[in-house]
Amino acid sequence: MLNNNNCAKIRIYSVEGKTIELVKQFTLKKRWVEELYLENSKLIILSSDSIEDNSNATCGVADDCITLNETTYIDIYDVSTPQNAKKIKSLSQSGIYKTSRFTNGYLYTFSAHLIMGECKSEKKISEYIPSVNGKTMKENKIQKIVDDPVNSYVVMTSVNLAKPDNFSDTAA
């Protein structure tokens, strides 16, 4: 895996004895790879908007509040035949990637969705409420600490790798 200014390149190699051969390569444009997992012939790539590329990680203004429009991505590939690796699912959640854990077949991903200022307008609610897969999270999945001076959310998601169709659960 190589990260550079505009993209991340993922390379899959075959190793037999002293011979190493590149069998597959693909690029994630405007992404920065944060973490990789390999489990049961599935490659999980966790990435975020490229730090050097501001076209995706810009500041949006919603009245008197500014949100950092950063996104964490979870891309799942079938690598059972490495030379024919193919993406089987791509998921996303608001915020910059912070950490993840893989346990008992589930991937848990944590990101930080930051808001600066006070958000009082409902006109731009999608700008400051966390989202998963491009959809604003439901109210019953969000808890806000009232006295939090930072105005931020920790966005938490879980994916069952046996059925990676969608998130198993979400919360903020």
Give residue spans per PLM region.
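Beta-sheet-rich non-transmembrane sensory/scaffold domains
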Residues: 1-172
